[in-house]
């Protein structure tokens, strides 16, 4: 019988009687277990990423799907891809049960609709070159399960991130990632360790894909969008370091070309000074 580790009683009790320091130390003690749990899933993450990269090289997209905290984390990771790596917002798409309103407020029973997730994928023109990753700590969210089931039936690559073993969601995924973090500090509050594990794994998936797709040079975000002064300053210093330019010359070069990568390529194409 399927057992929800995410619903098991906390290892701690009488929380209301603890001091602030005790609560913080307890939570930190539990959080230290998360990185260890994630490290055990690296082979699972690797297998999924190795399948995603060639699809995205051919123009495929990546969809994240979730409800509540899981959905918000998927939207968060997807929203960071354009500014960090200079990719269009349609390259990685985060979908949350209940739509954008659910990012700030709970939408009653949105996650219980088995058909809605697939309908939303269809509205984005999902096809067999794309990948759908379902995110659900429990592994039982109908919105996500229904979407993955239909995606898989239509020949679309599927993966999932969940915090229980042998969940219904994992059964619908080609490449399940089961990250077992144990009972939550507040019983059943999967926004805590499970959510932290999801965020770490999403970071690993998207960052490794972008590196494999050539969106990072050395260790630098050479394709980042220059959307604020901090990023313009960062890009300027990248060019200063690479080409021994003054700050003003590097900044002028960067703003002329609009990206570190293009500015760098323009410098390399210049004939050497005689």
From Swiss-Prot:
InterPro entries: Etherase_MurQ, Glucokinase_regulatory_CS, MURQ/GCKR, SIS_dom, SIS_dom_sf. One of its GO terms (biological process) is amino sugar catabolic process. It comes from the Bacteria. It catalyses: N-acetyl-D-muramate 6-phosphate + H2O = N-acetyl-D-glucosamine 6-phosphate + (R)-lactate. The keyword rRNA-binding does not apply. CDD domains: SIS_Etherase. The active site is at residues 80, 111. The keyword Transcription regulation does not apply. GO terms for molecular function: carbohydrate derivative binding; carbon-oxygen lyase activity; ether hydrolase activity. SUPFAM superfamilies: SIS domain. Pathway: Amino-sugar metabolism; N-acetylmuramate degradation. Keywords: Carbohydrate metabolism, Lyase. Homodimer. Specifically catalyzes the cleavage of the D-lactyl ether substituent of MurNAc 6-phosphate, producing GlcNAc 6-phosphate and D-lactate. A lyase-type mechanism (elimination/hydration) is suggested for the cleavage of the lactyl ether bond of MurNAc 6-phosphate, with the formation of an alpha,beta-unsaturated aldehyde intermediate with (E)-stereochemistry, followed by the syn addition of water to give product. HAMAP family: MurQ. Belongs to the GCKR-like family. MurNAc-6-P etherase subfamily. This is N-acetylmuramic acid 6-phosphate etherase.
